[in-house]
Amino acid sequence: MITVRLPVSLRTTADDVLHVGDEVRSIADLIDLLDRQVPGFRDQFEQGGFNVAVNDELVIHGVHDHEVHPGDVVEIFPAIAGG
């Protein structure tokens, strides 16, 4: 099982954690799953609205192809810009 931590804007329940099974093998699979649960998520993600970390490591390059495995913790959080 993979644990996915979600920001408030993506929660479909009061819980901030989603558990997904073997059907999710990559961040691309996770994006597909979340887009079915939260319509418009894919568009927001593709426009740079969110960042992804897997096991506390920020995924910067090749996000869609990044593999996830049982026991991983994936965090999706809003992208923040500033200077």
Model-derived features: positions:
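Ubiquitin-like/PB1-type beta-grasp interaction modules and other compact soluble beta-rich domains
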Residues: 1-82
